């Protein structure tokens, strides 16, 4: 009974141990991984809003400002700018925060005032991997999207203009995208290239016609690619406000990643009240988000240079000019300022940028569609990127003009050299968001292969299937149960083995001897007397001389020899 209880105790102990290990594995598997936090600031957010971003080792914070304008009065479009916090002496930091700020201006009325470029979205990505050597700065990407301006340039060109000459109609996007040499513009280039651009861009409509107009701002992360069609409206450009005393100050939204884990979004003057629009749509928290702004004509404003931090440069702006609203054709420009640690030339494509953000593989592809009218040929801007204290070679590349469409897709907007630069910006393998050489100019820009490495690598996660868990349980339970059985058998054998006297040889000898004498008891004979001598012996008894018993009638009996009796020397009698 005791032995069976011991075996049961051993099996119960092994079962409890297996159960504890299984629960530990299940807890390790089901522990939720940190997700990217997403803060959405609606248009009604008061000035000075503090957005707190958790400062983990790899955390991406997306701040999106939607600024819809009511009917009638023009208002300033937001010019968000995300500026990195530079590190002194080029030491490799240990944390990475990527803040992407984007502003969408929702168009409304048909008679709104179009004076300059509408939102100028500047996304400065602070990429700080640990494997970066000293003296090498993180790449800085600035994206500016001016959707509307007046058509005729002024005589005084803007400061430090770097603009590529217009692309001929027969040229391909690869050639236009790969050339990165900035060409100074010609002052009289407006009248020279007006007709060529009008022929290349047939979608420009005269004043007063109805056409679909709006801005679709999409942040692609993973496989979430959804959008909402904008509402059609008309664009009525008027006399610009640039250079007058009544020119309003730009509304600047700054999202600055600082070590204090907060992002400050200050706002300045705004001419018109803002209200929330149903166009802001937020997708699933875990996978990604899609933001769509619906509305009518954008109330375009001028975003001038207004620094928001000591390290931040002014927001890039484009000066609108006087002229006929129907002279210039419609096109949209993208400005991409990249400040990498090496002086490698790179090309850009309008409406698409990919941010390399630290050791977590994450790709943010922004597709912006902003059809507009009347951007002059000679007008250009110079976006200034916030530079780091370390040695940085700044290269300003202007984007190529492209045709105005209702919705700008990413099928033919992905450049090949940009993906190469992004993938080789940092030497760490985990920082490579886009594999080099996978995207080609002629192929469709499918982002499904980028989303495969989209999961955060915060820790070594263990993913086990049901069969794996079953094998683990068997591998743990079988040795424990076998050991318990062996211990039980050994204990039983030890208790059976006791001190047995039968193993001694002398015991058997004594037993055999005693048993023999007990069974074969020999009764010694008494005196045998004959009738003749009985009287004589009674009369005179005498003893045999010198032990001679031959004549006395005595019988010597050998107990070990039971066949014969010796009576004297010559008399043998059988018993």
UniProtKB/Swiss-Prot annotation:
Record PTM text = Glycosylated.
Q: Which GO terms describe its biological process?
A: cellular response to brain-derived neurotrophic factor stimulus; dendrite extension; dentate gyrus development; modulation of excitatory postsynaptic potential; neuron projection development; positive regulation of neurotrophin TRK receptor signaling pathway; postsynaptic density organization; receptor-mediated endocytosis
The subcellular location is:
Membrane; Postsynaptic density; Endosome membrane; Cell projection, Axon
- Where is the stretch described as Interaction with CYFIP2? 490-575
Is Glycoprotein a UniProt keyword of this protein?
A: yes
Q: Report residue spans for region: Interaction with SH3GL2.
A: 31-169
Keywords of this entry: Cell projection, Endosome, Glycoprotein, Membrane, Synapse, Transmembrane, Transmembrane helix
Stretches for region Disordered: 65-398
Q: Which residues cross the membrane?
A: 9-29, 469-489
Give membrane topology per the record.
Answer: Multi-pass membrane protein
Region of interest (Interaction with DST (isoform 1)), ranges = 173-407
Cellular-component GO terms for this entry = axon; axon cytoplasm; dendrite; early endosome; endosome membrane; glutamatergic synapse; postsynaptic density; postsynaptic density membrane
The record's InterPro entries line, in alphabetical order, gives:
TMEM108 (IPR031508)
Low complexity compositional bias, start-end: 74-87, 146-160, 290-318, 353-366
| Compositionally biased tracts (Polar residues) | 95-115, 244-271, 329-352, 367-398
Q: What does this protein do?
A: Transmembrane protein required for proper cognitive functions. Involved in the development of dentate gyrus (DG) neuron circuitry, is necessary for AMPA receptors surface expression and proper excitatory postsynaptic currents of DG granule neurons. Regulates the organization and stability of the microtubule network of sensory neurons to allow axonal transport. Through the interaction with DST, mediates the docking of the dynein/dynactin motor complex to vesicle cargos for retrograde axonal transport. In hippocampal neurons, required for BDNF-dependent dendrite outgrowth.
Could you describe the subunit structure of this protein? Interacts with DST (isoform 1). Interacts with SH3GL2. Interacts (via N-terminus) with CYFIP1 and CYFIP2; the interactions associate TMEM108 with the WAVE1 complex.
Protein name (Swiss-Prot/TrEMBL): Transmembrane protein 108
Annotated organism of origin: Homo sapiens
